Curated annotation (Swiss-Prot):
Subunit-structure text: RNase P consists of a catalytic RNA moiety and about 10 protein subunits; POP1, POP4, POP5, POP7, RPP14, RPP21, RPP25, RPP30, RPP38 and RPP40. Within the RNase P complex, POP1, POP7 and RPP25 form the 'finger' subcomplex, POP5, RPP14, RPP40 and homodimeric RPP30 form the 'palm' subcomplex, and RPP21, POP4 and RPP38 form the 'wrist' subcomplex. All subunits of the RNase P complex interact with the catalytic RNA.
Entry keyword annotation includes Nucleus: yes
Gene Ontology biological-process entries: tRNA 5'-leader removal
Keywords: Nucleus, tRNA processing
Cellular component annotations (GO), alphabetically ordered: multimeric ribonuclease P complex; nucleolus
Matches recorded under Gene3D superfamilies: Ribonuclease P, Pop5 subunit
An example Gene Ontology molecular-function term: ribonuclease P RNA binding
Species of the source: Mus musculus
Protein name from the UniProt record: Ribonuclease P protein subunit p14
Tree of life domain: Eukaryota
Length: 122
């Protein structure tokens, strides 16, 4: 009786980019960042974990809210895991403890426009 042959199939994401909705939380209140400082924070988080190669990843800040320190980021799909892990491990900005919270991730920007858990159906 012949053995059954198994074939491993890996499907790569057809999407060129992934979008992340993130929020930056500080332990102390009253810390403010403009969009340029926020972008620099992302690059330094990537540099801390992955060196200059990580810092060279193309990350775009599509929207940024200075009041809530939240943003929607666009990253090439191949760099998603690197960005996510560097944000997770980032812990301080100018000697002030902080943490990135990843709220949503999707290959579709439209998916980040609303939250289905808060949707009211009539």
């Amino acid at each position: 009786m012949p053995a059954t042959a198994y074939e491993r199939v890996v499907y790569k994401s057809p999407s060129e980019y992934h979008y992340m909705k993130v929020c930056l939380e500080f332990q102390e209140h009253g810390v403010g960042l403009n969009v340029a400082q926020f972008k620099q924070l992302l690059v330094s988080a990537l540099r801390d974990l992955f060196g200059e190669v990580g810092a060279a990843l193309p990350v775009d800040v599509l929207t940024y809210d200075e009041k809530t320190l939240s943003a929607i980021l666009r990253i090439c799909s191949s760099g998603l895991v690197k960005l996510w892990s560097s944000l997770t491990l980032f812990g301080a900005y100018k000697s002030k403890k902080c943490a990135f919270r990843v709220i949503q991730v999707s290959p579709f920007l439209l998916a980040l426009s609303g939250n289905s858990r808060e949707q009211v159906l009539d």
